[in-house]
Amino acid sequence: MAHSRARRRKRASATQLYQTCKAAGTCPSDIIPKVEHNTIADQILKWGSLGVFFGGLGIGTGSGTGGRTGYIPLQSTPRPDIPSVPTARPPILVDTVAPGDPSIVSLVEESAIINSGAPELVPPSHAGFEITTSESTTPAILDVSVTTHTTSTSVFKNPSFADPSVVQSQPAVEAGGHILISTSSISSHPVEEIPLDTFIVSSSDSNPASSTPIPASGARPRIGLYSKALHQVQVTDPAFLSSPQRLITFDNPAYEGEDVTLHFAHNTIHEPPDDAFMDIIRLHRPAIQSRRGRVRFSRIGQRGSMYTRSGKHIGGRIHFYQDISPISAAAEEIELHPLVATAQDSGLFDIYAEPDPDVTEEPVSLSFSTSTPFQRSSVSATPWGNTTVPLSLPADMFVQPGPDIIFPTASTTTPYSPVTPALPTGPVFISGAAFYLYPTWYFARKRRKRVSLFFADVAA
C-alpha cells in the first residue's frame, strides 16, 4: 500500500509572524529587518542618498512627494468666477423753477443764517480824511538838474616795461577755391632773432641726420640650447655646416637648403654615415651664437627611437654644435710689406758694371760626393771678360747620392796639348744604381751616336 505524502502547509507572511513573535522575542532573523525596512539594500539606499544628488527626482526610500516641484494633477477643475454686478447710482433730484420765480437763485438760503446774538457792525459814514480827485490835461514836468563829475588820470611811461605788440590778422579771402590769409608784419617794437641750437649730446663729430628717437630694443629671447632636456653632441665633420643631410641619409638632389627644417623618414632599420645621427627624424634650422669667445653653429635634432601604433614618434632631443672660429678680443695689427721691390732686392743686373770691390771673391768648390752638404758661402763674382754673374748658394743643402760622372782629360806629358772645349764632348761613364732618367728618354728612339775624337800630330 503506497503511503501518501503529507501536504505542505503554507507559511504565514512576514507581517503575521512579526505581530506574534515581536513581543515574545522569537522572530526569525529575516523577519524584523524586512518589516522594519532595515535590510542591506535599505541601508545602501539610506547612506548612498547622503552623497548622491538625483536632481530633485524624488528617488529614495521616503514617501513619494514628487520632488521639489511636486506632482501636477492631470485634470484640474478651475474654480468658478463670481461675476461683478455694477451698483446703481441714486438719482439726483432737481428742483423745478416756476414762471413767477426770480431768475437769480440765491446759493445760500436766508433761513440758513443763524444770528448768534452779537451786535451788528455798521461801517461809519465819514472816514478820517477825504480823497479829492481832479482831472487836468497839463503834463507834469519835473525839474531835474544834471550834475557833472570830472575824473583825471595821470600816465607815467616805464622804460623797463614794453607793451606786447598786437597784430591783427586780416579776414580770410577766398579766391578761385583757395583761402588766402594775410598777416600784418608791421610792429612798433624791435624784433630779437634768437638762433636755434641743438641739445643733443653726441660723442661723434657727425650730427644725427634726423631727430627721430631710436626705439629701445627689447631683450632678445634666449635660446635654451643648454638645458638638461637636451643632450649635447659636438660634431667635427665640416659637412655639418653646408649639407647636414649627408650625415643622416644619402645625398638628395632635391634638397631645398640648409636654412629650413629637415625631415627624414626611416621605414627600415638603417645605419647613418655618422653614428651620432642615429634615429634622427627631424633636424631644425640652424642658429649661430657666441659661446665662450667662439662662434658656434647649432642645430636641434629630434630622435625617433620609439613610435606608437598611431604613428607618433617618441625620442629625446639632441643639440648638435660645431665651433667655427674664435672671436678675437682686439684687432690684430699686421705689418704690411711694400709691393714694389727695392733696388737692393731687384733681380736685374748690369752685366757691364764693374765688380764690387767690397765683395770678396772666393772660389766655389763643387763636390758631388755622397751625402755631402754645401756650406754657406758669401756671394762671389767670377770675372769672364766684362760680364759679371753673381752666384749665391743657399745654406746647408744636402746632396742625394747619385751617379759619378768621369770626364776624359788629355795627357800632360807632352809640351803641347789639344784645346779642350768648354763643354764635355767625350764619352760619359755612369757608375751607380740610384739615378733616374729624364721622362722623355723613356720613349725616345735609340740612335747611334758618333763621338768625334780630337787628334793632334805629335812632333818627334
From Swiss-Prot:
It is found in: Virion; Host nucleus; Host early endosome; Host Golgi apparatus. Highly phosphorylated. GO terms for cellular component: host cell; host cell endosome; host cell Golgi apparatus; host cell nucleus; viral capsid. GO terms for biological process: microtubule-dependent intracellular transport of viral material towards nucleus; symbiont entry into host cell; viral penetration into host nucleus. Minor protein of the capsid that localizes along the inner surface of the virion, within the central cavities beneath the L1 pentamers. Plays a role in capsid stabilization through interaction with the major capsid protein L1. Once the virion enters the host cell, L2 escorts the genomic DNA into the nucleus by promoting escape from the endosomal compartments and traffic through the host Golgi network. Interacts with major capsid protein L1. Interacts with E2; this interaction inhibits E2 transcriptional activity but not the DNA replication function E2. Interacts with host GADD45GIP1. Interacts with host HSPA8; this interaction is required for L2 nuclear translocation. Interacts with host importins KPNB2 and KPNB3. Forms a complex with importin alpha2-beta1 heterodimers via interaction with the importin alpha2 adapter. Interacts with host DYNLT1; this interaction is essential for virus intracellular transport during entry. This is Minor capsid protein L2. The gene is L2.
